Amino acid sequence: MKPIELSFEFFPPKTADGVEKLRATRAQLLPLKPKFGAGGSTQQGTLDTVLDMQKDGLEAAPHLSCIGSSRDSLRAILDQYRSHGIRHIVALRGDLPSGMGEVGELRYASELVSFIRAEHGDWFHIEVAGYPEYHPQSRSPKADLENFARKVKAGANSAITQYFFNADAYFRFVDDARKLGVDVPIVPGIMPITNFSQLMRFSEMCGAEVPRWVARRLESFGDDRESIRAFGADVVTSLCQRLIDAGVPGLHFYTLNAAIATRTICERLAV
C-alpha cells in the first residue's frame, strides 16, 4: 500500500519566541516526511515563514488571499515567491475586512486562480479550499459546491478541505464534487483536539460541526487537559483511520504551530 501523504499547516509567528517555537515544532514533525507545509496571514509574515521552512528542506505552500489586494500587489507577491523558487500556492479569497464590503480587484478565489495561471502558467501547483460542511457565508450547499467547482476548473491542481469530524460529510462532498466534473485530489483537513473552548470558538467561526457527543465529553473534562488531549487523540485518530481506509489522497493537519497532538495521531496511524 502506498504511504499516505501528510502535509502540515502553520501560521506566521508574531514574536521572536513564536518563531523559535515554530522551528521546534517543525523539527518534531519533519521526521514524518510531510509533502509540504502551508501557512499564511500577513504577506511579509508569510514570506518570512516560508523562507524559514525552505531552510529546513520542507516544501512551502504560502497562502495567498485576493480580498483587499490589487492585481499589481498580487503580481508582485507572486513574482517574489517565484524568485525564491516557491512552486506551491494555496489560493484563497480571504476574509472581508471588518465593516467593509467587497474590496480589491479580485473578489473570488476562482478569479485568483485564473490570475495566477495567466501570469505564471504552470509554474505553481495551486491548492484551493473545500468545505465539506459548506462555507459559513455560502448562500446554499448547491452554490457552495458550484463555487468550489469553479475554483478547480479555473486551474487548481488540488484542494484541501476545512476540518471536520464527520467523515460522511467529507465523502458526500467529494461525491457531489465529482458529479460536477471536479477530478483533482481533495485532501481532508484534520484538526487535532487539545483545547475545548478553542475548538468550539474556531468551529463557530469556520462553520465546522463538532458532534454533540464529542462536545459533551470534552466539556465534562473541565480543566483536565490530559483527559481532553487523550480523548481528542482517540477521536481524531479514528477519523483519520476511516479516511485512510477509504483511500483519501492525503491528510492535511492544522497544527496550530504545535507538534505533540499531530505527531501522536500520526504515530498511532503508523504513517
Task: State each model region's role.
Residues 3-7, 36, 59-63, 88-90, ...:
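Structural preference for beta-strand elements that scaffold enzyme active sites
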Residues 9, 32, 81, 151, ...:
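Conserved, mostly hydrophobic/aromatic
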Residues 10-13, 37-39, 63-69, 94-96, ...:
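Active-site beta-loop-alpha junctions enriched in small/polar residues
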Residues 17, 104-131, 180-233, 238, ...:
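Active-site pocket-lining/capping segments in soluble small-molecule metabolic enzymes
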Residues 19-26, 40-58:
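Glycine-rich, positively charged N-terminal anion/phosphate-binding segment
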Residues 33-49, 94-104, 157-172, 256-258:
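Glycine-rich, proline-tolerant flexible connector loops at the mouths of alpha/beta enzymes
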Residues 66-83, 103-108:
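Glycine-rich anion/phosphate-binding loops
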